[in-house]
UniProtKB/Swiss-Prot annotation:
Gene: Segment-6
Function: VP5 protein is one of the two proteins (with VP2) which constitute the virus particle outer capsid. Acts as a membrane permeabilization protein that mediates release of viral particles from endosomal compartments into the cytoplasm. Permeabilization activity is probably negatively regulated by VP2 and is triggered by endosomal degradation of VP2 and exposure to low pH.
Protein name: Outer capsid protein VP5
A Pfam family annotated for this UniProt entry: Orbi_VP5
Cross-referenced InterPro entries: Capsid_VP5_Orbivir
Gene Ontology biological process: symbiont entry into host cell via permeabilization of host membrane
Species of provenance: Bluetongue virus 1 (isolate Australia) (BTV 1)
Length: 526
């Protein structure tokens, strides 16, 4: 269990602090009044800060030594359905989620219409029965079937899809890690197809990157969504690799409405079982190797990163299948004896036993302080039910404070075994506010508002799904906390833009490119 409380870094922050530093006070005590007036000027404070740190460069640019403005790129692609909302705008978040759901439904239906026979041949006729049950077009024998059997078929079919997806991803990763001469014919074909997709993505990203402004955090605007999804899908389960409707595991599950059937019959929400359409580490690798060939080993790392999310989803489904469904069946039998209900149907009372509060679902939950809400907000990030982990990530942007802490697990009907470790969300939130209240840089009014906020519960602003694995999500959060250079690049622009950049860096990651600004050229053309 870990806890980190740090001050956030911004460009020019060291310059701003130069006048109040102990080193600056010593300098002021040894120089005359005229020199002190120079020191209090804008260029003077930069000069002192620069000289103290050994960099005359800061005199010209207003930056401290080592602070160079570079290009920063959020590792998502516009047009992929993964646009980043302002986390404090609940309406914006809900509208984007609903639009994505509608678009996905339409695309998944195309997959079912195009590949129905091949999918049934590979994963069994049970998929069609589940789909017909959900659509109300079930045959007489299916209607007579027990609802629990339909639920079992939906879970089993989903398990088959995730097993196959995991297997194919591991095959691709193993092929990429082998020497070219050691690959079988099938592995060579698989790697060649994958490399063709990477080249298509690389070309699209390179075109966008050339048009980026130097001094802004950017998102990559990609190709049309259909082409983008086809190009970024490592191994389609059915059909050609670059078809317009790709039969991915995600698309097959959506086409046959497996999660919806499971939710309708059991009350168990599995919408958190997601995989990224475009793996952020792939975008990062392409940006890193944009001027040279990408080695197979780097691509293998990206494939394994995406496979972590698939394996996490698979473990979650096995947890539901092996741990939760037997308890669900037992609850059904108990309810049947008490209420005398029909054996074929599942009573709503049974479903309600397995409902969990929205604030404990495996998502990124967003809260803000009741006062000074634009600046003081935090994320509560919860893992899949089988892992039962969570962490707190709080920000006070008015005084540049960040607080990360691993929290204790919640108990609920779908959770795994508990361990008494860590603190609760409420305890972490109160300590976060206490640290902000005691900060010397806060204004008197801000401190008063924080004291008031501490007396009441924070405002819940909704939740967002994350597509990457929880391990990668935690890694992104810790990088935001520890990486000063990343902080400098995401904490620029209007306050709502900074919040979006923080959320983007958390959900997808952020790549700070190594291209340094050509300062003489910049000043010459300014």
């Amino acid at each position: 269990m870990g806890k980190v409380i740090r001050s956030l870094s911004r460009f020019g922050k060291k310059v701003g602090n130069a006048l109040t530093s102990n080193t600056a006070k010593k300098i002021y005590s040894t120089i005359g009044k005229a020199a002190e007036r120079f020191a209090e000027s804008e260029i003077g404070s930069a000069a002192i800060d620069g000289l103290v740190q050994g960099s005359v460069h800061s005199i010209l640019t207003g930056e401290s030594y080592g602070e160079y403005v570079k290009q920063a790129v959020l590792l998502n692609v516009l047009g992929s359905g993964e646009e980043i909302p302002d986390p404090l705008s609940q309406g914006e978040t809900e509208i984007q989620a609903k639009l994505r759901e509608l678009e996905d439904e339409q695309r998944n239906e195309l997959v079912r219409l195009k590949y129905n026979d091949k999918i049934k041949e590979k994963f069994g006729e049970e998929l069609e029965e589940v789909y017909e049950f959900m659509n109300g077009a079930a045959k007489a024998e299916v209607e007579d079937e027990k609802q629990f059997d339909i639920l079992n078929k939906a879970v089993t079919s989903y398990n088959k899809i995730l097993t196959e997806e995991d297997l194919q991803m591991r095959r691709l990763a193993n092929a990429l890690q082998k020497e070219i001469g050691e690959r079988t014919h099938a592995e060579t074909v698989m790697v060649k197809e994958y490399r063709n997709k990477i080249d298509a993505l690389k070309n699209a990203i390179e075109i966008e990157r050339d048009g980026m402004q130097e001094e802004a955090i950017q998102e990559i605007a990609g190709m049309t969504r259909g082409v983008l999804e086809a190009a970024s899908e490592e191994v389609p389960l059915i059909g050609a690799g670059m078809a317009t409707a790709v039969a991915t595991g995600r698309a097959i599950e959506g086409a046959y409405k497996l999660k919806k059937v499971i939710n309708a019959l059991s009350g168990i929400d599995l919408t958190h079982l997601r995989t990224p359409k475009i793996e952020p580490s792939v975008v990062s690798t392409i940006l890193e190797y944009r001027t040279r060939a990408i080695p197979d080993s780097a691509l293998a790392v990206s494939v394994l990163s995406k496979n972590r999310a698939i394996q996490e989803n698979h473990k979650e489904l096995i947890h539901i299948k092996d741990e939760i469904l037997p308890r669900f069946k037992k609850a059904m039998d108990e309810e049947k004896e008490i209420c005398g209900i029909e054996d074929k149907t599942i009573h709503p009372k049974v479903m309600m036993r397995f409902k969990i509060p929205r604030a404990q679902q495996p998502q990124i939950h967003v809260y803000s302080a009741p006062w000074d809400s634009d600046d003081v907000f935090f994320f509560h990030c919860i893992s899949h039910h089988h892992a039962n982990e969570s962490f707190f990530l709080g920000f006070d942007l008015s005084i540049d404070l960040v607080h990360y802490e691993d929290l204790t697990a919640h108990w609920h009907a779908l959770g795994a075994a508990q361990m008494a470790m860590g603190r609760t969300l409420s305890e972490a939130y109160k300590e976060f506010l206490n640290m902000a209240i005691s900060n010397a840089y806060g204004t008197q009014m801000h401190t008063r508002r924080l004291v008031r906020s501490k007396m009441v519960h924070p405002i819940y602003l909704g939740s967002l799904h994350y597509d990457i694995s929880f391990l990668d999500l935690r890694g992104n959060a810790q990088r935001i906390v520890y990486d000063d250079e990343l902080q400098m690049h995401i904490l620029r622009g209007p306050i709502h833009f900074q919040r979006r950049a923080i959320l983007g860096a958390l959900k997808f990651g952020c790549k700070v490119l190594g291209d340094r600004l050509d300062v003489p050229l910049f000043l010459r053309n300014a």
